[in-house]
Amino acid sequence: MATAQPSQVRQKYDTNCDAAINSHITLELYTSYLYLSMAFYFNRDDVALENFFRYFLRLSDDKMEHAQKLMRLQNLRGGHICLHDIRKPECQGWESGLVAMESAFHLEKNVNQSLLDLYQLAVEKGDPQLCHFLESHYLHEQVKTIKELGGYVSNLRKICSPEAGLAEYLFDKLTLGGRVKET
């Protein structure tokens, strides 16, 4: 295997930032993979919550797009894309919409922390281009996603009980159904 040649376009792009972006790409891919698992759980015939399916499928697509955007940045800046193994989701059956939404909420907070750490590294390494990229494409969107999921979790907690099948069905149709059609 040939050793990679140094990039001729690389300028003031610290190797630590390069490595941190590769780590964040892995996190975005894992998140996409996990949301795909959630989506198709809700698409099963014995679960049949169509709008949960659509919602998590859209989140999966968004996370894949985020990973690809970071890969394009790596190439633009003269970095080297180094893909890592994507671990298997710990949970395969999501039990309920509430459990899935809570998992998504905590996952998005982890993604946000990774982005904040990456941003801080870019500041420390004096990389205004990376700071601007993260501000323009990720940070605000991430906060909006956390807020949205937090609201969904709060609403589901209010309406869910041990036998909350009807409440979950109504949440799927009325809340997520309207949300999916807007996008």
From Swiss-Prot:
A Gene Ontology molecular function term for this protein is:
ferrous iron binding
Name of the protein described by the UniProt record: Ferritin heavy polypeptide-like 17
Q: What InterPro entries does this protein's entry cite?
A: Ferritin, Ferritin-like, Ferritin-like_diiron, Ferritin-like_SF, Ferritin_CS, Ferritin_DPS_dom
Question: According to its UniProt record, what is one Pfam family this protein matches?
Answer: Ferritin
UniProt: Fe cation binding residues:
28, 66, 108, 142
| Residue ranges of domain Ferritin-like diiron in the record | 11-160
BP GO annotations: intracellular iron ion homeostasis; iron ion transport
Q: Gene3D superfamilies in the record, alphabetically?
A: 1.20.1260.10
Q: In which tissues is it expressed?
A: Testis specific. Also expressed in several cancers.
Quote a single Gene Ontology cellular component term: cytoplasm
> Which family does the similarity line name?
Belongs to the ferritin family.
Is Iron there in the keyword field? yes
* Source taxon at top rank: Eukaryota
Q: Which UniProt keywords apply?
A: Iron, Iron storage, Metal-binding
Q: Which gene encodes it?
A: FTHL17
The answer on whether this UniProt entry bears the keyword Cytoplasm reads no
